[in-house]
Every structure is written in structure tokens, then in C-alpha cells.
């Protein structure tokens, strides 16, 4: 089991999320949704998770992702915290790595 690391928010904003080896984000026709595929199975994603994970390209930082989604959804409140919490959960599930 991966150890839980603590990252300050200011440091987290400058990390770049990338998908871990063995985990693939893709549209799954049979599920009619985006999924995370991994050797043991798949996880069907909701719309919010999909919007966040679509931003992961190995170049954008967490701050960039927050800025992009905030521009798409200017009336959303608490978006930055929601994105950060989701990315932390995705990392704890080993879907992504925050570099």
C-alpha cells in the first residue's frame, strides 16, 4: 500500500499530474462514458472527473488545470478545492502521480 504523503497547497499547485503506467483514461463505448482502465478492471467516471482528467497532458500544472476549468465554469464556487481534492483521491488510488 502506498504511503500517504502530505503536500502543502502552495506546492501542490505547481505539480504536474500524469497518468501512472498501467492506467489509461479513455472513452469506453460499451459504458457510454469515460473510464480509467487498469489491469484489474476499469472505473467508470462521472462528468466532473472526466472534465478534470481530460486536462492531464503531462504539461499542465494543477494551477493550470484550475485556471482552465475556472474559465470554463466561471459561476462555479469552490472549484479549486474540488479539483485539488479529486486529484489527491486520484493519486491515492494510483491513477495519477503528481510530479
Curated annotation (Swiss-Prot):
Keyword terms: PQQ biosynthesis
Pathway in which the depicted protein is active: Cofactor biosynthesis; pyrroloquinoline quinone biosynthesis
Record carries keyword Oxidoreductase: no
Pfam families from the UniProt entry: PqqD
Gene3D superfamilies: Coenzyme PQQ synthesis protein D (PqqD) (1.10.10.1150)
One GO term of the biological process aspect: pyrroloquinoline quinone biosynthetic process
Keyword Iron applies: no
MF GO annotations: quinone binding
Superkingdom to which the source organism belongs: Bacteria
Biological role: Functions as a PqqA binding protein and presents PqqA to PqqE, in the pyrroloquinoline quinone (PQQ) biosynthetic pathway.
NCBIfam families reported for this sequence: PQQ_PqqD, PRK02079.1
Family: Belongs to the PqqD family.
HAMAP family from the UniProt entry: PQQ_syn_PqqD
Subunit architecture: Monomer. Interacts with PqqE.
Protein name: PqqA binding protein
Organism: Acinetobacter baylyi (strain ATCC 33305 / BD413 / ADP1)
